[in-house]
């Protein structure tokens, strides 16, 4: 019940940003409409609900976003930073079976981090929650990932520090188009498109 109350409050605050309304860019509109807020009941959702147990509703919602993003991006690699379960891996691989899974943990050395970021390949997805030494990790990602990559930053509204950091990333010269989904932020590194930041009622 508490989840639904919080979700409703967030929805009310962002109601004017629903479904891509008011977005001028055709590409951004399609991404919001058909990836972020796509409500089509993919047949795999039911299978994944049975396969992935023990996660809360918000995590399930984000997992489904990762599924759709993987289906859209068709990433060569999904680099998962500080995973606490295999749920994101399972949903990403369901969205794109060819995706190679890699992870960064507390035990991963700096040398290995650089190697992983440098070798992810084109159109890859990188998940970074704002925990541990996230600033250093994001900086390495921005320096070494190919421009076709997309980074998902989780916990961007956790506290004022996280919100301020997200604002920094949106303005960073190394980032391209970004989407503030409240529960997470999505950053594309392709700078061929006009840089813009969108707030989306996800």
Set out the residue ranges of the language-model regions.
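A short alpha-helical cap/connector motif
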Residues: 1-147, 157-202
């Amino acid at each position: 019940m508490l989840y639904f109350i919080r979700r409703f409050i967030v929805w009310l605050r962002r109601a004017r940003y629903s479904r891509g309304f008011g977005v001028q860019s055709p590409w951004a509109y399609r991404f919001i409409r058909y990836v972020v807020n796509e409500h089509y009941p993919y047949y795999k959702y039911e299978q994944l609900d049975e396969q992935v147990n023990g996660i809360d509703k918000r995590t399930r919602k984000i997992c489904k976003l990762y599924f759709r993003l993987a289906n859209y991006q068709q990433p060569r690699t999904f680099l998962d930073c500080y995973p606490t379960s295999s749920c994101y891996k399972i949903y990403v691989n369901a969205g794109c079976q060819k995706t190679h899974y890699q992870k960064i943990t507390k035990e991963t050395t700096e040398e290995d981090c650089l190697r992983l970021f440098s070798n992810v390949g084109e159109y890859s997805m990188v998940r970074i929650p704002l925990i541990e030494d996230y600033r250093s990790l994001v900086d390495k990602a921005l320096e070494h990932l190919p421009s076709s990559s997309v980074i998902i930053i989780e916990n961007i509204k956790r506290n004022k520090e996280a919100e301020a950091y997200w604002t920094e990333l949106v303005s960073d010269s190394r980032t391209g188009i970004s989407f503030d989904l409240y529960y997470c932020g999505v950053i594309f590194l392709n700078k061929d498109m006009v840089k813009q930041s969108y707030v989306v009622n996800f």
